[in-house]
Regions:
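Short, surface-exposed ligand- or partner-binding patches at beta-edge/loop junctions that are enriched
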Residues: 65
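Rhodanese-like catalytic fold shared by cysteine-dependent sulfurtransferases
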Residues: 1-23, 29-61, 70-115
Length: 115
């Protein structure tokens, strides 16, 4: 599946409250995650997805997010070609933050930010 043809949803269509059966998968790198992420997100860096497929839910909605939407589109294409039903989040965490949706940081005392 081509990353340009993956199913997508905008941040405004998805947030601020995810559906009850939904998982928001953040595929950014560890430093990006630590600086700021959606509070309900699950973190698996893009480079680790193929080795961690067992960590992903087998049912429910899977929404994939990165910084701007490029990596998550590639991850969505990969997941869909391997049996999941994943949806890319257009605009990524940049759009999430710009819309004023909640962010948390893993760094003690640091204000959350998208890097």
């Amino acid at each position: 599946m081509n990353p340009q043809s993956v199913p997508s949803v905008s941040v405004s269509e998805l947030a601020p409250e995810l559906p009850a059966d939904a998982v928001l998968l953040d595929v950014r790198e560890d430093d990006e995650w630590a600086a700021g992420h959606a509070p309900q997100a699950v973190h698996i860096p893009m480079g680790e997805i193929s080795g961690r497929l067992a960590d992903l839910p087998s049912d429910g909605s899977l929404y994939v997010i990165c910084r701007a939407g490029g990596r998550s589109a590639r991850a969505t294409a990969y997941l869909n070609s391997n049996g999941w039903t994943a949806v890319n989040v257009d605009g990524g965490m940049q759009s999430w933050a710009a819309a004023g949706y909640p962010l948390v940081a893993e760094l003690t005392g640091a204000a959350p930010e998208i890097i």
